[in-house]
Amino acid sequence: MKAIQFDASKPLDLIPLGRATIDLNPIDYYKPLDECVTFKRYLGGSPANIAVGLARLGKKVGFIGKVSNDQFGKYIIDYFANEGVDVSHVTRCQGGQRLALTFTEILNENESSIMMYRDAIADLMLSVEDIDEAYIQSAKALLISGTSLCASPSREAALKAVALARKNGVPVVFDIDYREYRWQSADEIALYYHAVAEQADIILGSREEYDLTMALLAPGLDDAGTAAYWHGHKAKIVVIKHGKQGSPPIPATASITASSLSR
C-alpha cells in the first residue's frame, strides 16, 4: 500500500481552498420556498465547513478564499476566527462581488432541493496573486474544492496552489464537489477536474462526480476500474461515495469505500 506522508513539523494540519458562502435554510419546514417566510443563516460551502469541522475537532486549520467586502464577508471572517480557523489568507473582493447564497427547499422528510445564486460571486474572484507559497508550505495537506475550478480567476489560483503543494511535498486532497453552476461544457468539467485529480494524493467524490471527471480520458469505468485508474496516477486513497446506498468493496488495497451512515 502506498502511504501518505504528513510532515508533523508543519503548524497547520490542513488548508482548504475554495468557497465560503451563506446558506439560508427555512424554519418553515415542509413548504415550497415561495411560501417560506423565516430563514436561518448558516455558513455554507463544502471547504468552509470542512475547515470549521476540523477546527472543532482540535485541528489547526487555515483557509484560502475570497469573500465579499461587506457585512456578509465580515460574518464569514468572524465566524472562521471564532471557530479557530486561521483567516490570514481570506481576502476581500474590491470589485463589488457578493457572497454566493444557497436556499434550501424542504418539502417533506424525503424531498428537498437547493437553489443557488452564483453570479458575480466573491469566491470565484480568488486570483493567483492570493496564493502564497509560504502559506502552503506551512500545511500538512492542501484541500482543493472542485467548484473553485469552474471559472477564472479562481481556476488558475487553484491550479497554482496544487502546483506549489506538489513542489513542496504537501499532500493534495481533491474534493470533486461538483455544482452545475458556471461550467460551460462537460468537456471543460472533465479537463480541469482531471488536471487536479491526477495530482491528488486523496480524491473524494460520488460515482457521478467521478464519471464527470473521467468523461474525456477514461469513460465508462466501474468503481474498481476507477480506483485502479487513479492509483495509476498519484492517488493513494480513492473514496467513491454512493450516498444512502453505501458503496461496494473496491479490490484496491489503498482505496476506501464510504458506506451510508445512520443518523
Roles of regions detected by a PLM:
Residues 2-86, 259, 263:
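Glycine-rich phosphate/adenosyl-contacting loop at the front of the ribokinase-like
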Residues 24, 115, 152, 213, ...:
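Residues that scaffold the ATP/ADP-binding catalytic core of kinase and kinase-like folds
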Residues 134-135, 195-196, 231:
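Structural alpha-helical scaffold elements that stabilize or flank donor/cofactor-binding regions
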Residues 147-226, 245-247:
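Conserved beta-alpha-beta core of the PfkB/ribokinase-like small-molecule kinase fold
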